């Protein structure tokens, strides 16, 4: 591989100047604030919700994603501060990013069941759409870890975004999933729990589906609404259970025993895709930076926007 020849940039930065020290100090304070917000997003719905999730034998959303990724592989989180300064929790009730699974770069979008039972709203929908756009533009597989109560349709008093504000866009969201398939970009979904209404369309529009036994519940509506509309008395397993979808509807290609088994199967599916991202590979070796990246903290003034 040919090395690109160029003259190294000579820095004139004075690391001992007062201006540099002031800028660096201000930047470190802002980074600390950013990390606190990211920690808040990671906490999701709080310890009580995480305890209830663990009591049902389920993994937190971030553990699901990191078990899916190759060990020690790079991961770039997407929209970690979604819904910041809104009426919804930071992170938008979802965890997303670009990572590597079975050696294949992919985009992962995962509902956080500890936040509003994974219900989707204006901010989480925007995050979801951004993930699909990246998958489409970069031609890399799109992975969904689904556990969602569907759309949050509740009216919220004083909310900047009404409960129905995102609902009109739902058709576009599902269209984008099918567009990925049309472009031969693989879509893989693991259903870890309830996927109601709009949440049911996530696996419904995907190429490969893995449902966790006795947990996945994929249906447009639950038994009470079915009884109200048709008079039929049914169970959740009858309407949307994993076993039913594997044996009758055909929506589920794979049945998993638990969360970890579902993730294992998803990694196997990835390994069988035989997928290569289109585009040019690096054409030359890249040398490490001459100067420390920490020096960047003292260059930019904190008031610069």
Region annotations inferred by a language model:
Residues 1-79, 220-305:
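Amphipathic alpha-helical segments at domain termini/boundaries
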Residues 146-278:
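Conserved catalytic cores of soluble enzyme domains
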């Amino acid at each position: 591989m040919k090395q690109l020849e160029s003259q190294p940039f000579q820095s004139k930065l004075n690391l001992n100047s007062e201006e540099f020290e002031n800028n660096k100090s201000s930047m470190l304070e802002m980074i600390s604030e950013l990390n606190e917000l990211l920690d808040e997003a990671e906490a999701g719905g709080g310890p009580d919700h995480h305890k209830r999730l663990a009591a049902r034998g389920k993994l937190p959303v971030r553990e699901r994603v990191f078990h899916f990724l190759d060990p020690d592989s790079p991961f770039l989180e997407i929209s970690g501060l979604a819904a910041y300064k809104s009426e919804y929790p930071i992170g938008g009730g979802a965890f997303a990013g670009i990572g590597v699974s079975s050696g294949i770069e992919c985009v992962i979008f995962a509902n956080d069941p500890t936040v509003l039972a994974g219900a989707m709203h204006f901010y989480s929908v925007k995050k979801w759409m951004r993930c699909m756009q990246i998958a489409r533009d970069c031609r890399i597989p799109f992975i969904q870890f689904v556990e969602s109560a569907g759309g949050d349709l509740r009216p919220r008093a004083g909310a900047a975004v009404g409960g129905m504000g995102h609902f009109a866009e739902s058709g576009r969201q599902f269209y984008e999933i099918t567009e990925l398939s049309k472009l031969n970009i693989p879509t893989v979904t693991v259903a870890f729990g309830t996927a109601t209404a709009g949440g049911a369309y996530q696996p419904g529009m995907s190429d490969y589906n893995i449902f966790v036994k006795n947990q996945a519940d994929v249906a447009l509506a639950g038994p009470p609404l079915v009884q109200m509309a048709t008079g039929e008395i049914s169970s959740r397993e009858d309407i949307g259970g994993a076993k039913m979808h594997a044996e009758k509807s055909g929506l589920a290609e794979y049945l998993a025993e638990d969360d970890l088994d579902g993730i294992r199967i998803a990694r196997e599916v990835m390994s069988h895709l035989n997928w290569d991202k289109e585009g040019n590979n690096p054409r030359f070796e890249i040398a490490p930076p001459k100067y420390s990246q920490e020096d960047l903290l003292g260059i930019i003034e904190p008031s610069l926007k």
